[in-house]
Amino acid sequence: MTKNNESFTHRNFAAVLQKYKYDLNLGDIVAGTIFSFELNGVLVDIGTPVSAYLPIQEVSSNQELNNFNSLNINDTREFFLLDYNVESRQLILSIRRLEYIRAWKRIRQLLAEDSLLDVRIKGFNKGGMIVNLEGISGFVPNSHLNNFSKNTSSTNKFIKLKLLNVEEKSNNLILSHRRALIAQASSNLIVGNIIEGVINQITPYGLFIKAGNLKGLVHISEINVKQVERIPSQFKIGDTIKAVIIHVDKKQGRLSLSMKHLK
């Protein structure tokens, strides 16, 4: 394959196809049949006098499938019309780009439905967890992992997540384990209910409580007035306390608690 002429425009492309009275545009989705394997790609019949070529790097967004093993002679499927190579006079096709478009469409649907997801873990870095959703790389920040243990033995396993932030234009996909845990326990997380948990962090603005897989915050304003100035002496990490649920933030996966409202 030769490098595409960068000066080639959509108008030039239209002119090439108008010569054959064929109505196609870059970005179109076309049906085609694979009829020949080349060294670095396959030839595809899409019904045009101009030949169509699928480079190996455009076979799939999945690195494990980005080879010829998933393709066969006479396979008929849809392709994304990616480019036109002036020098080789070939239409350049892509399955990878088509998968990308459909993946984001599916993700937008999952976001609208606020779905609880089973997502494959791809690895970890200092900031959190790297996952794969619909072939798109996503990220779970440490602040939304709750108590999930970050270790290599978890790689390729599945974790329950919910979407947190989706920005298709910047290819930014942020998910939350914390939101998923709140959703799974939602039937028991009723405002006014009393829960019991263990203090796992003491800060100037309150107490962080671990109750099972969930984390909650007793803000300093929700601790008994007499105890506010003596938090370090009144509480220590590992203490078991009871608190009342005063707010469940399902969008951020946060649990707000109060000790002032205990009867």
Swiss-Prot record:
Family label: Belongs to the bacterial ribosomal protein bS1 family.
Which positions fall inside the S1 motif domain? Answer: 27-96, 114-178, 192-260
Q: Which domain of life is it from?
A: Eukaryota
Q: List the subcellular locations.
A: Plastid, Chloroplast
Pfam families on file: S1 (PF00575)
Q: What is this protein called?
A: Small ribosomal subunit protein bS1c
Q: Which GO terms describe its biological process?
A: translation
Query: Which species is listed as the source?
Result: Porphyra purpurea
Q: Which InterPro entries match?
A: NA-bd_OB-fold (IPR012340), Ribos_protein_bS1-like (IPR050437), Ribosomal_protein_S1-like (IPR035104), S1_domain (IPR003029)
Give the CC-aspect GO terms: chloroplast; ribonucleoprotein complex; ribosome
